[in-house]
């Protein structure tokens, strides 16, 4: 084992992609981060996104997938969710940088006169701002500890116009911090052509040539393929791309994303990187990860959880929710299969019965807008009347309150989000959100965002799940429960408002005490779930779902 260096020097690892998008750069980077963490190194991660939006907060979920919210209230790329889950640590908003943020800051500096009359250009001003944000990740954490490694994923594909400033900034970073402190990983596609029965290396060769043409020579290549890349082909790629053969990594499609760290370790990527960067290390501690993989591949139980959503045509729109459901399964030594249910199909009792009659638990996640709302409310009604375990998230809580109010006799109960003129606004716009909703203020970045505390009622279902009375969860919403209706709803159907903000003004948790498990939260607990440490609300949901399944089978 090598000895720690006397002077701390942070190393920077850049992950780029070529040939095609959606190759799994984020999962590759996350898995490498998990491996290096398991070797005792302090790792942090960052995503550079080459789109002009300041953040993904106002982007269509069908295009971008979910928006991942950090503790400090940043709306970020879904890859940050992978980073947090694989590293088992919280990241800040600094971990996601967009072209929109960079240009906004540079233009603001120009208006303030900070460039002293310079002609502001992509090089050096834009690239300098990008480098500043990369190097910012080297700052000490809350415990005063600096990272050993910063892994930065550069979004997009090599050759894209919009990615060029980020790639140039990465190239310059190598010059600024020293070549011995930088490691470039290029993720590339090796397609299999069925008619000829061949794996083709030419796309990777062209992709690496494009990368080299802008001054970046990759230290390692991660070859994505639907099968293992044989050694002779790896040797050919190493020769043609001028990469050490031990730096050519085969990464075939895996049955579970949680197998990828094992795949990269088997190919010795972590050992190769550590040697090249002269990092101190220990052997990989696989105990926790092996325990996870046993639960992934050899669960004792199975159940089906319905996810009733508006954006199910793109599963990435609910990525953290589905991973939290699966993690809840792992915590119960069970395989939780997700059944995707379009919310529109659950509007009627017959439709809900058809879609939800064979499931063991139901989740209604967050979302925006009126489309599909009555179907979500129908799913809530089905869960309540058929005593199916249920968890509502953000909008799911609001739908649960609307359904409860209607069941309590407030037949016109609705939300001002869906019906601004409703006579029974059981869900209403938060006071500080009125300007954004009316169009007088910006929509982007103005919601109630980030971690907020809540106080739970002693003896409540949620307090039992959390095993504490004080919790903190991440939020992303503009609407809240109208307190004027709380008592009427409780008296009418027995719904309990079991958790609020510390001042008691904002409803954070609700539940039916006499239901096997029917809970909802205004927060997004899925963001804090980890594969090795499931979120308590999802663990409790799966536990109740397994009991429901066993009771149904008797």
Swiss-Prot record:
What pathway does this protein act in? Pyrimidine metabolism; CTP biosynthesis via de novo pathway; CTP from UDP: step 2/2
Q: Which reaction does it catalyse?
A: UTP + L-glutamine + ATP + H2O = CTP + L-glutamate + ADP + phosphate + 2 H(+); L-glutamine + H2O = L-glutamate + NH4(+); UTP + NH4(+) + ATP = CTP + ADP + phosphate + 2 H(+)
Q: How is its activity regulated?
A: Allosterically activated by GTP, when glutamine is the substrate; GTP has no effect on the reaction when ammonia is the substrate. The allosteric effector GTP functions by stabilizing the protein conformation that binds the tetrahedral intermediate(s) formed during glutamine hydrolysis. Inhibited by the product CTP, via allosteric rather than competitive inhibition.
For binding L-glutamine, which residues are annotated in this chain's numbering?
367, 395-398, 417, 478
Q: Where does UTP bind?
A: 21, 200-205, 236
Record-level Gene Ontology MF annotations: ATP binding; CTP synthase activity; glutaminase activity; identical protein binding; metal ion binding
| Positions contributing to CTP binding | 21, 160-162, 200-205, 236
> Which residue range or ranges hold the Glutamine amidotransferase type-1 domain?
304-551
Where do the segments described as Amidoligase domain lie?
Answer: 1-279
Q: Name the positions where Mg(2+) binds.
A: 79, 153
Assembly and interaction partners: Homotetramer.
Query: Other remarks on record?
Result: CTPSs have evolved a hybrid strategy for distinguishing between UTP and CTP. The overlapping regions of the product feedback inhibitory and substrate sites recognize a common feature in both compounds, the triphosphate moiety. To differentiate isosteric substrate and product pyrimidine rings, an additional pocket far from the expected kinase/ligase catalytic site, specifically recognizes the cytosine and ribose portions of the product inhibitor.
Protein name per the record: CTP synthase
Organism of origin is Corynebacterium kroppenstedtii (strain DSM 44385 / JCM 11950 / CIP 105744 / CCUG 35717)
Gene name tied to this protein? pyrG
């Amino acid at each position: 084992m090598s000895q720690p260096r006397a002077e701390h020097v942070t190393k920077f690892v850049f992950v780029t992609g070529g040939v095609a998008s959606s190759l799994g750069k984020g999962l590759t980077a996350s898995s490498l981060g998990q491996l290096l963490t398991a070797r005792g190194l302090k790792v942090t991660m960052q995503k550079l996104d080459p789109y002009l939006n300041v953040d993904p907060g106002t982007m269509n979920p069908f295009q971008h997938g979910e928006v991942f919210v950090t503790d400090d209230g940043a709306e970020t790329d879904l890859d940050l969710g992978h980073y947090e889950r694989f590293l088992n640590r919280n990241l800040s908003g600094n971990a996601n940088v967009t072209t929109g943020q960079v240009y906004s800051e540079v233009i603001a500096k120009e208006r303030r006169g900070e460039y002293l009359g310079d002609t502001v250009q992509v090089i050096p001003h834009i690239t300098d701002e990008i480098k500043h944000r990369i190097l910012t990740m080297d700052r000490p954490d809350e415990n005063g500890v600096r990272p050993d490694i910063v892994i930065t994923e550069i979004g997009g594909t090599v050759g894209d116009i919009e990615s060029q400033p980020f790639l140039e900034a990465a190239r310059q970073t190598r010059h600024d911090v020293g070549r011995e402190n930088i490691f470039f990983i290029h993720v590339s596609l090796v397609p299999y052509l069925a008619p000829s029965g061949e794996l083709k290396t030419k796309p990777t060769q062209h992709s690496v040539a494009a990368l080299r043409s802008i001054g970046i020579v990759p230290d390692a290549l991660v070859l994505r393929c639907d099968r293992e890349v044989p050694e002779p082909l790896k040797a050919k790629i190493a020769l043609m791309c001028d990469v050490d053969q031990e730096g050519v990594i085969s990464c075939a499609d895996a049955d579970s994303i949680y197998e990828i760290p094992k795949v990269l370790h088997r190919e010795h990527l972590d050992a190769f990187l550590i040697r090249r960067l002269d990092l101190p290390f220990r052997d990989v501690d696989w105990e926790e990860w092996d325990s996870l993989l046993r639960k992934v591949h050899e669960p004792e139980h199975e159940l089906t959880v319905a996810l009733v959503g508006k954006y199910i045509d793109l599963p990435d729109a609910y990525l953290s929710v589905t991973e939290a459901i699966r993690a809840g399964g792992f915590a119960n030594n069970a395989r939780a299969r997700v059944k995707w249910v379009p919310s529109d199909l659950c509007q009627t009792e017959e439709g809900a019965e058809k879609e939800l009659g064979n499931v063991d638990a139901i989740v209604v996640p967050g979302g925006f807008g009126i489309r599909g709302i009555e179907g979500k409310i129908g799913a809530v009604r089905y869960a309540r009347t058929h005593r199916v375990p249920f968890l509502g998230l953000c909008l799911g809580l609001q739908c649960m309150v609307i359904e409860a109010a209607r069941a309590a006799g407030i037949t016109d109960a609705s939300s001002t989000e869906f019906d601004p003129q409703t006579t029974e606004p059981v869900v209403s716009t938060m006071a500080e959100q009125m300007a954004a909703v009316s169009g007088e203020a910006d929509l982007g970045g103005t919601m109630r965002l980030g971690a907020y505390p809540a106080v739970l009622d002693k003896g409540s279902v949620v307090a039992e799940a959390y095993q504490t009375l004080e919790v903190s969860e991440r939020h992303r919403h503009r609407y809240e429960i109208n307190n004027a209706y709380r008592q009427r709803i409780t008296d009418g159907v027995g719904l309990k408002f079991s958790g609020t903000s510390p001042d008691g003004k904002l409803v954070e948790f609700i539940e039916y005490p006499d239901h096997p498990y029917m809970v909802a939260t205004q927060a997004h607990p899925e963001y804090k779930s980890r594969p090795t440490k499931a979120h308590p609300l999802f663990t409790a949901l799966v536990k109740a779902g397994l009991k429901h399944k066993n009771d149904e089978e008797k």
